[in-house]
Swiss-Prot record:
This is Ribosome maturation factor RimP. GO terms for cellular component: cytosol. The keyword Protein biosynthesis does not apply. Required for maturation of 30S ribosomal subunits. Its main location: cytoplasm. Coiled coil: none annotated. InterPro entries: Ribosome_maturation_RimP (IPR003728), RimP_C (IPR028998), RimP_C_sf (IPR036847), RimP_N (IPR028989), RimP_N_sf (IPR035956).
Amino acid sequence: MLLDDLYEIVEPITADLGYILWGIEVVGSGKLTIRIFIDHENGVSVDDCQIVSKEISAVFDVEDPVSGKYILEVSSPGMNRQIFNIIQAQALVGFNVKAVTLAPVGSQTKFKGVLERVEGNSVILNLEDGKEISFDFDELKKLRVSPDFS
């Protein structure tokens, strides 16, 4: 699978450069966009993104993991970072999040609330209406931090 191959190639590159690979997202059809999110204990600058992008591009030129043309984007995960795995979710307990499910729960697929806790492979949200809801992480299409500026 493309995503697994990309992680296998990109993880050692980012680690060797001193960055944390936060996640990889592949979007589009035809000409793909490969988004690589990096983090660092001191934050991530534009220069950091350029360094990582240059190294990854050089390896992609040799390994050729993507057939056809693609766009490579390297950035920090940002304040409204996507949560790519259960370990990241555990570290973000207490944060406001938005969740999108793969299949409707009741009649909705979008939920907003506080990431209350993580139990095994499940995330438990305290929704804005005070109700608690649990999702298996694999049932989520997307889970993202939703900063509250109020």
